[in-house]
Amino acid sequence: MGIKFRLIVMNFLQYAIWGSWLISLGAYLGGGLQFTGLQIGSFFATMGIASLFMPALMGIIADRWIPAQKLLGICQLISAGFLVAAASQTAYGPLYTCMLMSVMFYMPTIALSNSVAYNALDLAKLDAVKHFPPIRVWGTVGFIAAMWFVDLVQIGGVQIKLTYWQLYVSAILSLILAIYSFTCLLYTSPSPRDAHES
């Protein structure tokens, strides 16, 4: 499997995970669970909260102790676990907590996947400025494909986007990417200088 194809698959999955619920979650929360507009908005605010510090924290860990592709897999596993837990919740408090924790571990994976891609292209002696954009566009394709899937596919005569099944779809994709990260992505070592300084 060529390096560019591996990175295309990684980007496709990375953003398909997000596309499975980002656009449709509001329909489930408002329609299926009858949450208020303020409550629904708070779920989307979790991404901003997580982005304040989690990417930087995971970046430090990847730089010093754990290879980026391994940390990517670990974060995806944890995020998937919280998505599964979220799918079984119907009360605002527990569901919000599960989604917040899931997003806490998902948001850093965006930067981690970029780091893995740039490192892999560098190891393959490919110009990242030239080769990364066509790879990254497959992330957008993955997002749209997942969004269409939950919009169009029905379970028991009900669109997935109106049910908790969208969270299971996202969790399954997250698990697949975790396994893929552990088995198919090139090794990205922590910085020897940073590890020594720590």
Residue ranges of each PLM-predicted region?
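Helix-loop boundary and gating motifs at the non-cytosolic
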Residues: G2-G48
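Hydrophobic core of transmembrane alpha-helices in multi-pass small-molecule transporters
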Residues: F12, G93-T109
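Residue-level signature of mid-helix packing/kink "hotspots" within the transmembrane helices
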Residues: G48-L52, A56, I144
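Helix-to-loop junctions at the C-terminal end of transmembrane segments
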Residues: M54-I66, Q154
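Structural signature of the two symmetry-related core transmembrane helices
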Residues: K70-L83
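Cytoplasmic helix-loop-helix junction between adjacent transmembrane helices
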Residues: Y106-I135
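Symmetry-related core transmembrane helices of the 12-TM Major Facilitator Superfamily/SLC fold
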Residues: Q166-S181
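Single conserved hydrophobic/aromatic residue that forms the stacking wall/gate
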Residues: Y187-S198
